Every structure is written in C-alpha cells, then in structure tokens.
Amino acid sequence: MSKNPLTAACVILSVISASALAGLCVFALKNDQLTNINTKLSHDKSSLSTSLSEAQAVISELRSKAETEAVTEPANENTVYIYDNGIDVIEYPEIEGALFNDYDMSLLETDEKKHKALFDRNGNKRSRFGIDVSSYQQNIDWQAVKADGVEFAMLRIGYRGYETGQLCEDKYFRRNLEGAKAADIDTGVYFFSQAITEAEAAEEADYVISLLAETNARLEMPVVFDWEFPTDEDPARTEGLSGDVQTACCRAFCDKIREAGYEPMYYSTINTAIFRYDMGVLSDIPLWLAEYKADTSFVYDYRMWQYSCSGVVDGIEGLVDLNILIES
C-alpha cells in the first residue's frame, strides 16, 4: 500500500447524531472553507431541530459547497477532520509515516445474514469472510461453520488477567484449533494483552509461541496483539498507561512474533488506533480494525475489519464477531 499525502485536500468525515442528523458525508475542503462552514453551523445550532428533512437539507448544503468551491492547498496535507454531531470539529493529529487504504466501500456487499464481501471495480472479490472466537462461544460445530461460508477463524489462544497479570490459556483454544483444522478452515490466533511494559509484552509473545509449538499449530492467518481497556468497573492494572507505552508494547510483541516466523498483526478500535497507538511507528504491522457499522470510512490502512459483534453463524450458539480479510 502506498502513502497518500493528501496533497489535494483534507478529509472531512461528517459524523451526525441519530437524533439530529443522519448519514455520513466525506468532504474535501481547504482550511478556510472548513472555518466558514463551522461558523455557519455554530450560527445555525440554535435553529436545528430533530426533523430529518431539515437535517438532510443541512447535509445537502454542505455537500454542495464542498463540491462546487475550488480546493487548493490545504492548511495541513496530512490532517483528517471529523464533524461530531454536525457542530464540533475534531482534528485528528497528523500521523507521520501512516499509510492510507484504497478500499472502495461502495463495492461492499452484505447478504441476509450480514455476511460481507468486498469487490474491486472489475467485479472480482477481494475479501474473505471469517469469525473470531474464544471460550465465550463454548462448543462449536466447525463443520457447520464451514458450510455457512466461513473461510477463516481467529482463535483466542490466551490472555493476561486484568488485575493479577497472570498469563492464561483460553480453555477452548485446543479444541477450537482441532475443530477448525478438521473443517479445513484457515486459522490464526489472538492474545488478549494487558501488558504494561515492553518486557511483559515480550513475555506474552513468548507464551504464545510456546503454545503454538506445543500444539503443533500450523497457521495460515496472523498472530494478533489484542490490547484493550477493561469494559467493567473492576480495577485494572493498565489504568493510566500512556499511548507511547502501549505502542511500545505492541511493537515488542509483534517483533517477537515476526522473529519466530509468524505474521504479526494488532487489533484496535478507531479511537485507540488514532489517539493512542502511533500508527506511523506500527506502519509495517497490519491492523485489524474494529468498527461495528454497515461500512467504514476509516482512511488509514488496515487489513482485517471486525464489523459486527452480534453475528449469526451456523454451528455456533449465540452471537459471534464477524470479519472480512481484505486481500491486496
């Protein structure tokens, strides 16, 4: 994937609240145009209503302005802007060294079960459909999963405890590995990290490498560093960890994995990728993006997209995460 310096324009993502504005508009505007529109929105804020027709009129006006006015030199060629609720403008920090993707989401197709596929302009499929599972899915009928069109599975191999920091193997990893292989489903693994130092991240990588050797696992998919903030109210050892340290932990884990002969990858939401990880430092490591939407306007490079946490797949009781792997 080549770098896109965005020399023609800044990218503006219009994220509109469901109660006031619906839809998402991407605009190419120079900096003074952005200022003018933001001023207009501020003046109009008091008159906005929940009427969908009025909201769409505002969107149409902004789109028309973006398309008709000349765009010359942007104030910052690597800046990405977001409209938040149609009023406030959030400026993404410039990410030196980050790569951009060339995916055309207008060519994304979704079937009745929410299974997605991305195509190129020649009609060729450029994605593969997959799931990620852990002990939460419990017993899985992998033959039924295969018959439902699943081409790959990312298996949780282990995790580090929120509070104790103890390294643990996912209790369903071995049976999931055996079942997926028997069904001829390509497999990769992810480790749920709570590392707070580079040394701990390297320890996690060594733990994963040891388990892969012990189970004689042959992987067709990456080994993923999955660092997430706890979602419950229990105290976590990762509280207060800086983005720089988190980036260093990811780097340490992925370097170890690569040295062992596996393909590394890191998992992240949009907010974590942009505002915590240094994507420039990690530009040689593929990103597994998590965004639960019908499509994604994420401009930076990613290889895998987790688009749903409430998917339905034959052979699995309950819900499961759905993904597509985008091939070059």
Predicted regions and their residues:
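N-terminal Sec-pathway targeting helices
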Residues: 1-17
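Long, heptad-repeat coiled-coil alpha-helices used as oligomerization/scaffolding rods
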Residues: 13, 17-20, 27-48, 52-62, ...
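A short, gly/pro- and small-residue-rich
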Residues: 38, 173, 304
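Functionally critical loop-and-helix segments that line ligand-binding/catalytic clefts
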Residues: 77-130, 280-328
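Generic detector of short, locally flexible boundary/turn motifs and exposed helical patches
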Residues: 91-98, 116-121, 153, 187-191, ...
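Substrate-binding cleft of extracellular glycoside hydrolase catalytic domains
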Residues: 123, 127-247, 258-260
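Surface-exposed substrate-engagement region within the catalytic domains
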Residues: 217-328
